Amino acid sequence: MKRFLWILLPPVLVVVARMHVEWVWFAQFNWQSVLFQRWMLQLLFAGAGSIPVFLAVLWLRAFDRIDDPPRQQKRPIDGMRFSLVLMVSGLAFLACSVVLSDLAILAWKQPFSLSHWQSTGHSMASEWKALLPIQLAIAGVSLCRPQLRRWVAVAMGFALVLVVSRAWGVWSLAWLIPDEGLREPLLGTDLSFGLGRFSAIQLGLELLVLSGTFTTAHAVWGRVTVSPHLSDWSMPALGNRSYRWLSIGVGTNLLGVAGLVWLSRHQLLWHQHGLVAGAGWLQQHLTLPFRSLLAFVLLVLGVSCIVRGIGHLQRLLLLCVAAIVIIESTLTPLTRWLVVRPQELALQAPYLETAIRSTRHGFQLDRIQRRRTEPNVDLTEEDLESGASTLRNVRLWDSGPLLETNRQLQQLRVYYRFSNAAVDRYPLIPDSDTSQQVIISARELDQSALPRRSKTWQNRHFVFTHGNGFTVSPVNTRGTDGLPSYVISDLGSNTRIEGNRDLGIKRKDVEAAIPAQNAALYFGMLPSPYAVVPTEVDEFDYPDGDLNVYSHYAGSAGVPIGSLIQRLCASIYLAEPRLLTTKAIQKDSRVLLRREVRQRIRAIAPFLDLRGDPYLVSVPGDNLELGTSGNRIQHQFWIAEGYTHSATYAYSAAVSKTDSDRYLRNSVKVVVDAYNGSMRLFVSEPDDPIIKSWQKLFPQLFESIESMPNILKAHLLVPEDFFKVQVSQLQRYHVEDPRIFYSGDDVWQVPLEVYGGEQISVEPYHITAQIEGNNSSEFLLLQPLTPLARPNLTAWLAARNDAEHYGELLLIDFPKDRPILGPEQIQALINQDPEVSKVFSLWDGGGSELVQGNLLVLPVGTSLLYVEPVYLKATKGGLPSLVRIVVSDGRGIAMDVNLSAAIDRLIKKTPYGITEGVSTDRLDESRKRSIS
């Protein structure tokens, strides 16, 4: 007994240490109750998962103990029959072992993928597929060794309990999800059935069938391979008791299969059938009746096996099952060819209408406000006056060139990294009713970029603990050398905060709107190891010339490790014994865990799907609740987007072949303190049934979006990832008439443009513009659209970002009877212009490279303005400099060093004086400056 206790001690210590660290980590947010609920749910479902395992063990023990004489009237099982029994039971044993072990691995690594592991064709990760030979080898050897086979059976029992326990989110969602109030027309179920309940029922039935099949196969194989049956290749017929007991096992499995077949009727609702997303005429009138009949026959077959055993009636029912499958497989293509195809539109129109309506609802396209506009042919002075707010914020700097410049001018040390640049708006001009568009980029510490000799344990976890600062540059201007004009740059005591005379921005207004001092970033986008702070070791804060400035963390984040017990738990949790031996730890030391923002959120809310990169905001104010860090006010926060999604939403079309989502909501905005690591989760889609379920389960975790501080709410952005999905679905589902949808003659596409010599799709971009009917300008996310296989501009979709109208979608249709030039056509006109082409050719060569930036289509008054920035950089690692702006109104083209000058040329219709004042010497000088 003592020996057993010593063996048990290490795993118990590991479990206790992990539970302690997790509990304390959740306690820093006052969310211990969330962790406790999750533990209790997993314990509850582990108990529920143990019930079928316990019943299977009882059944196996009872079957193995039966020693009744063979039935004399039955002939022995030999020859081909023996081979068939041996092959079927062996293959079933192997297949169930592999699937159950794969599910256990998936449950351990990605438990929230269990809900769609099969219904959406979930494929195991490649590293798990590499385990297949090992799994087959172990299961194969166990077939030959009874003792090993029993251990495999025990392992499969644990695997089943693990899967059921780790799938707590699947079962909880199914139990708590409210009705949406909308019903699908085929089976009459509420649409919430597909969002939550279907996956849970399917997973439960699949696990029961897998475990039942494994148990039955294990029992049959054990009986068949008992000596001397295998050597004789024959065995006597089973006795009456054994036969009845085996019939009960087979019948139970058949009941599970019947349930899966009955449930598969719902799968017709979210499988694409030709043009119809969901069940069409053929599925309703042929597939559905056959599946219902098949489920009924399997149900009768299963019940009869349990009640009467396997006999002539059961064999007849089995033949009926085969006949139903064959008849359906034969009739389906015949009916499609002879009945549906000749009158497809008439038969499918009601189903197409349902699919259009459901797809639009699944991706919130039904919220779109649609308007029609007819832009003027020429850009006029009146347009410039009414569109002044738009022209003041035209984005001339793309993220790519700006990040390149940041990395060369602002990283300052090899271990700093600018991984993302986000477009945002800040009130930098107090008297203006329009916020200034800027690009903000965080300077994070990249541990992987440390020199090899510097990658010591102490450096990685005690010294290089955080990034520092950020850059802010207006989107619509450049410096005298063509480089970005920063209003905030550099870091630490050398942080430069500047105004911009051309834009009317004053330094004091920048300081008031964007706090930049003490901007230590302990939590960020980049993966970071744990950090131990504060300690006896000085933390690197920032470089100051040739010297380094050091600091100590003064926040409240982290798990305390001041006492010996706390250090022991942390060292076990992190598998790091050096935490016990180092002398750098002091009484108030803590270990910062999960410092990557998305990892941090997933630990708290694993049911949220996090897409896209979090973006940094820096805001004034000392009453943000989650922003206080000891005696220090923290102003930098990360905002991340949390989604709820489903691949089983009735009659909704999937996004693509690789993205099976049929329902998507940007339901949660997560704000993370960049210094203190505190988090708040704000519900931005309170009507979403899925997020309602999680609010019921964890009410302490969520807040309404109305409770978000206004200073943060002013920086909310419609996420580009969500917007792109909506644009993708809109390309076909902007049509609401089934006849037009069926004809396919009004399909849209995202236009193409040439960027850096490569043809790419036009990305969504932000503009500040005044919507018709509004008195003030708004911050919009815009996507131009063109007809399929035609370059003319047909529409654009705009997402509104400002608080009052946040998330509203506006679709602007352009006239079909007059061609409006699209981005691809305008770019072709620019490149074909002889004067422009001459200048471009002059720059693009001799060690320099010309890059035509993103072409923007902007509403200016009642006209359209096309704007394309032009960058010049050295071929090998040069700084991209903004050298020219090309503009067009669809008729004329003009180019100059800044936007206002280029527009002035366009309005005055100056005959292509685009090289005026730009001598070859100046071009050479620009090239040299870029190269240097």
Swiss-Prot record:
Top-rank taxon, per record: Bacteria
Signal peptide: none
InterPro entries per record: UPF0182
One Pfam family matching this protein: UPF0182
KW Transmembrane (keyword) present: yes
UniProtKB keywords: Cell membrane, Membrane, Transmembrane, Transmembrane helix
GO CC entries: extracellular region; plasma membrane
Keyword Disulfide bond: no
Subcellular location as annotated: Cell membrane
Annotated TM spans: 4-24, 40-60, 85-105, 124-144, 151-171, 201-221, 243-263, 293-313, 315-335
Major subcellular site: membrane
Membrane topology: Multi-pass membrane protein
Family: Belongs to the UPF0182 family.
PANTHER family: UPF0182 PROTEIN SLL1060
Name the record gives this protein: UPF0182 protein Syncc9902_1151
Organism from which the protein derives: Synechococcus sp. (strain CC9902)
Phylogenetic placement of the source organism: Bacteria, Bacillati, Cyanobacteriota, Cyanophyceae, Synechococcales
